[in-house]
Amino acid sequence: MKEILNALYHQKDLSDKEVKKLFTLIIHEKVSPVQLGAILCALKIKGESFKEISVAATTLLEHAPKPFDSGLDLIDNCGTGGDGLKTINISTIAALIASSMGLSMAKHGSRSVSSHSGSADLLENLGVNIEMDPTQLENCFKQTHFGFLFAPLYHQSFKKSAPLRKELFTKTIFNCLGPLINPLRPKIQLLGVYDKSLCKTMALALKALGVKRAMVVNGGGTDEIVLHDITHAYELKNNEILEYDLNAKDFDLPPYDLKELQIENAQESVQACLDILENKGKDSHTMVVVANVASLLYLSHKAKDLKEGVSMTLEHLKTKAPYVHLQKIIRLSHA
């Protein structure tokens, strides 16, 4: 441990072996709170490399139980969170709609830290059992193409280190790891990050982890694709990483103000979700979710481009099938 700390104090990247050793010790609670705080802060100041992030994620996955084997190329759109802008749950609503369109969504997430409502909070408030056992999860997924994996059930180190991390008052490597440690190991990911400087690092980490297709985004300071500002994107495709910017015109959608996406409490997020699924949501809410669903369809080769993905999603919403789909998820999650 002393060698690892000294390397970080001198702002040196850790070797793969050192990262694996460090996170194995963290998993087994062999690192004191003082040491863990020092390590997280030193990593933050140095700047986490994509290798450190990917090896840490691999180590955590090696110790996480896999609930079932689907045999499919699963999709996740879990983001880092941490943008502090308190918007509606764009990615969670997008995952519900995408799964109602037949995409195999394995949604990894947790409760809110910086927002009014995290993915777990929203789903729980909608009536979904967020702590499904493996049998329930597999059954729900097989019948709805949607499964929610509540991160603390699979990664105890996240749960146990949460109080310490909260006291640091800063984002750490754990924010980066959250979207990378889905126990079902999705091969397609739409990953939002809280800072655009992380886009390339996270794209490289996804590539190192063996993800086939991905888009890492930061839109107007949020960890989502947005319509109110430019969305910076790094796309992983055919083992290459492409960098580009997106705006509302790329989706053939009008721009909306960020303020229209912000909410005051968790109940507002629940109502926004229900309204969107029933095709009666505010245009500003619906269209930003549609842009994110379109991106999932594009990454999954279900739409040839983003504009086609938008058209497909808007037509699907008219049927109100996503609302019926949610009711099925709720029922099966408790079965």
From Swiss-Prot:
The keyword Translocase does not apply. Homodimer. It comes from Helicobacter pylori (strain P12). One of its GO terms (molecular function) is anthranilate phosphoribosyltransferase activity. Catalyzes the transfer of the phosphoribosyl group of 5-phosphorylribose-1-pyrophosphate (PRPP) to anthranilate to yield N-(5'-phosphoribosyl)-anthranilate (PRA). Keywords: Amino-acid biosynthesis, Aromatic amino acid biosynthesis, Glycosyltransferase, Magnesium, Metal-binding, Transferase, Tryptophan biosynthesis. PANTHER family: ANTHRANILATE PHOSPHORIBOSYLTRANSFERASE. Binds 2 magnesium ions per monomer. NCBIfam families: trpD. This is Anthranilate phosphoribosyltransferase. Anthranilate 2 binds at residue 165. It is an enzyme of class 2 (transferase). Its cofactor is Mg(2+). It catalyses: N-(5-phospho-beta-D-ribosyl)anthranilate + diphosphate = 5-phospho-alpha-D-ribose 1-diphosphate + anthranilate. Pathway: Amino-acid biosynthesis; L-tryptophan biosynthesis; L-tryptophan from chorismate: step 2/5. One of its GO terms (biological process) is L-tryptophan biosynthetic process.
